[in-house]
């Protein structure tokens, strides 16, 4: 039963979706890749090194609570999910001009967000920004809604060390489906118009997709089907990554 265990969410529990007012975005403090980390390293300031497990968050620790199921080796787990809803290639035009709206709306409805802030990024590439530039490069684990680990870290993800398929939606339900990505396994953008940067659902524009059931590079770019890419009028799911 994929819904029996939940890892919690980006906020406390709740049932409302994002409201119609302005939405705040959270900042990663610069380029992705600066997350979390190792505890116990010597301090350069002469202060005692952080000790993971002492209950005190210090140094490069993101968390330090033995009772927190989302804290692993003093680095916070990041939730990932595949959307329960499908979109066509023009989803940017109906989602308040924000590529991340659907991820955050569904997360809010599922109780993963209650503070009206965008806490998830869509794994999608555009002509100006690749998926790797969009999502947070965590030193910690990317975890599914059922508690299973998708990848141990950003580095593991880039090495295609996929432990479990990213086939669980925001409601903890299994969903094996095609997913729009336009993204290579290394996170860079595939060539093409990206459905005119996600503003076209025309049959004569194309988009590359991944397979949520895959546990290898096919998760983001499925190569086992001659119909990849497909036309942008096809409906497909999206991947969502908690950031930061």
Q: Where do the model's predicted regions map?
A:
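Extracellular calcium-associated, cysteine-rich motifs in secreted modular proteins
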Residues: 48-76
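Ser/Thr-rich, Pro/Gly/Ala-heavy low-complexity intrinsically disordered linkers and tails
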Residues: 1-53, 63
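Secreted/extracellular ectodomain signature
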Residues: 75-244
């Amino acid at each position: 039963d994929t819904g029996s265990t939940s890892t919690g969410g980006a906020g406390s529990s709740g049932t409302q979706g994002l409201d119609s007012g302005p939405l705040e975005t959270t900042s990663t403090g610069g380029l992705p890749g600066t997350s979390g980390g190792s505890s116990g390293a010597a301090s350069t300031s002469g202060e005692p090194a952080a000790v993971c497990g002492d209950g005190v968050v210090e140094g490069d620790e993101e968390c330090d609570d033995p009772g927190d199921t989302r804290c692993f080796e003093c680095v916070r787990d990041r939730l990932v999910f595949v959307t329960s809803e499908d979109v066509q290639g023009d989803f940017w035009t109906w989602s308040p001009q924000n590529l991340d709206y659907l991820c955050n709306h569904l997360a809010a409805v599922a109780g993963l967000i209650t503070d009206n802030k965008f806490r998830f990024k869509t794994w999608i590439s555009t002509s100006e920004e690749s998926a790797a530039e969009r999502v947070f490069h965590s030193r910690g684990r990317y975890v599914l809604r059922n508690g299973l680990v998708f990848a141990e870290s950003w580095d593991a993800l880039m090495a295609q060390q996929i432990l479990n398929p990213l086939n669980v939606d925001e409601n903890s339900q299994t969903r094996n489906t095609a997913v729009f990505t336009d993204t290579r396994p290394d996170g860079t953008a595939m060539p093409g118009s990206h459905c005119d940067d996600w503003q076209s659902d025309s049959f004569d524009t194309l988009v590359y997709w991944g397979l949520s059931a895959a546990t290898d590079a096919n998760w983001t770019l499925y190569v086992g089907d001659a119909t990849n890419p497909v036309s942008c009028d096809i409906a497909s799911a999206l991947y969502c990554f908690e950031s930061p």
